[in-house]
């Protein structure tokens, strides 16, 4: 039954996209009650087959990665190289509110699916596109993944690691999900405009820009070369040793975060068991942490932190109201009481008989309640259903399948 409290009830999204970033935006709309129809080639979205690189068994019946990006959607297969396949797509666009894509612009132009062409045919349509590097400039047509466009080109991998070592190990989706949520926000705004004015719009987000926005504070600070540090840095070179992680006795890292150093100084020294340093004018003002004194404070904290376990520091810092968190592993998160209490995770029962934890999208709406978490569709699972809803007869569908204009999923 349709939940009319869902903000996107009655909205139709055509998703011409693969991998993660754009589908993540589509998932946001699907969770919000929109009908999101994902169009794939006969080979399917490559994300269906990435399990080995993630340390999972390859199974289409239990595909946690694909479910994260494509739950609650419908999936059809169209041959967009055929005239009939293109015709079906345009019939869908005529009734759609949003076209969501991660195709590169030159490919869209080649297929007559670029914004300038479509806005003449469908003036109310919102055109949403994820790119690697933006719409302009010498690299606008380069292929873009979050490993390359977000982490590397966007300034993450070149700065956020210990000086003298190597860039951090990156994992799939971290940059894509940020860009996808940015795009979802833009899509919602453009949809509101289209619904109130009758005029669609083009919404674009790039992976490179998403990373730059996330790092914006430090990118801007890098202009002041005579005042700041040039990253990458060593851990003990931080200008504020109260915003660093420290190793505990049992080899966990404990992250503290006290940007107003002066305010927290006495409290933190007391919590650390260094009451002798409370009020010490050498260290109690951040403006005094020059000429090596920041490193001295770092060393003091480091020496104290290894004297107790993470659980001991957990109790001490909670009692002292120190902003901190234990650096958790993914395995830790799967057992995290706070995550389960807030429905950040969902237990999916798969046809394989296994029950797996899946991560929910990080936006909740009180009145709508938690969205259903329906397993992502198999390749071409909804081709017949969607075409019948469009008015195609069984005979016409059979002919389209015979001519390879579409693909229909066969029941096993």
UniProtKB/Swiss-Prot annotation:
Binding residues annotated for CoA, in chain numbering: 102
Keyword Protease tagged: no
Entry superkingdom: Bacteria
One GO-annotated biological process of the protein: L-phenylalanine metabolic process
SUPFAM superfamilies in UniProt: CoA-transferase family III (CaiB/BaiF)
Top enzyme category: transferase
Key words of the record: Transferase
Temperature dependence: Optimum temperature is 50 degrees Celsius.
EC number(s) reported in the record: 2.8.3.17
GO function term, MF aspect, one: cinnamoyl-CoA:phenyllactate CoA-transferase activity
Active-site residue numbers: 176
Catalysed reactions listed for this entry: (E)-cinnamoyl-CoA + (R)-3-phenyllactate = (R)-3-phenyllactoyl-CoA + (E)-cinnamate
Signal sequence, start to end: none
Pathway listed: Amino-acid degradation; L-phenylalanine degradation
Comment on pH dependence: Optimum pH is between 7 and 8.
Membrane spanning residue stretches: none
Pfam families (UniProt xref): CoA_transf_3
UniProt function note: Component of the phenyllactate dehydratase complex FldABC that is involved in the fermentation of L-phenylalanine via a Stickland reaction. This complex catalyzes the reversible syn-dehydration of (R)-phenyllactate to (E)-cinnamate in two steps, a CoA-transfer from cinnamoyl-CoA to phenyllactate, catalyzed by FldA, followed by the dehydration of phenyllactyl-CoA to cinnamoyl-CoA, catalyzed by FldB and FldC. In vitro, FldA can use 3-phenylpropanoate as a better CoA-acceptor than phenyllactate.
Annotated family: Belongs to the CoA-transferase III family.
Description of how the protein assembles with itself and partners: Homodimer. Part of the heterotrimeric phenyllactate dehydratase complex FldABC, composed of (R)-phenyllactate CoA-transferase (FldA) and a heterodimeric (R)-phenyllactyl-CoA dehydratase (FldB and FldC).
Protein name (record): Cinnamoyl-CoA:phenyllactate CoA-transferase
């Amino acid at each position: 039954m349709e939940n009319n409290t869902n903000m996107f009830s009655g909205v139709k999204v055509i998703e011409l996209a693969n991998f993660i970033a754009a589908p993540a935006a589509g998932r946001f709309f699907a969770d919000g009650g929109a009908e999101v129809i994902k169009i794939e080639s006969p080979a399917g979205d490559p994300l269906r087959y990435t399990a080995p690189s993630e340390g999972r068994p390859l199974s289409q019946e239990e595909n946690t990665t694909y479910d994260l990006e494509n739950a609650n959607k419908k999936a059809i297969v169209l041959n967009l190289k055929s005239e009939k396949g293109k015709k079906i797509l345009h019939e869908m666009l005529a009734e759609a509110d949003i076209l969501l894509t991660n195709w590169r612009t030159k490919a869209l132009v080649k297929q007559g699916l670029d914004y300038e062409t479509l806005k003449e045919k469908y003036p109310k349509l919102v055109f949403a596109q994820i790119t690697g590097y933006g719409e302009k400039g010498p690299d606008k047509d380069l292929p873009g993944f979050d490993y390359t466009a977000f982490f590397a080109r966007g300034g993450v991998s070149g700065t956020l690691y210990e000086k003298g070592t190597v860039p951090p190990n990156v994992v799939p989706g971290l940059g894509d999900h940020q860009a996808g949520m940015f795009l979802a926000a833009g899509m919602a705004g453009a949809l509101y405009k289209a619904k109130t004015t009758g005029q669609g719009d083009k919404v674009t987000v790039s992976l490179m820009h998403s990373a730059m926005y996330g790092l914006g504070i430090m990118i801007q600070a890098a202009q002041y070369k005579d005042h700041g540090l040039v990253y990458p840095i060593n851990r003990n070179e931080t200008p504020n040793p109260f915003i660093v992680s420290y190793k505990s006795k049992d080899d966990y890292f404990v992250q503290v975060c006290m940007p107003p150093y002066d305010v927290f100084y006495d409290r933190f020294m007391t919590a650390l068991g260094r009451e002798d340093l409370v009020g010490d004018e050498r260290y109690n003002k951040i403006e005094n942490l020059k000429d090596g004194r920041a490193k001295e404070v770092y060393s003091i904290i480091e020496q104290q932190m290894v004297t107790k376990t993470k659980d001991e520091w957990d109790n001490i810092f909670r009692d002292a109201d120190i902003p901190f968190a234990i650096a958790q592993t993914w395995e830790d998160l799967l057992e995290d009481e706070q995550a389960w209490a807030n429905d950040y995770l969902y237990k999916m029962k798969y046809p394989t008989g296994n029950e797996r934890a899946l991560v929910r999208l990080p936006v909740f709406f009180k009145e709508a309640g938690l969205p259903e978490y329906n397993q992502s569709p198999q390749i071409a699972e909804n081709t017949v259903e969607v075409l019948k809803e469009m008015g195609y007869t069984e005979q016409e569908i059979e002919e389209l399948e015979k001519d390879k204009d579409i693909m229909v999923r066969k029941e096993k």
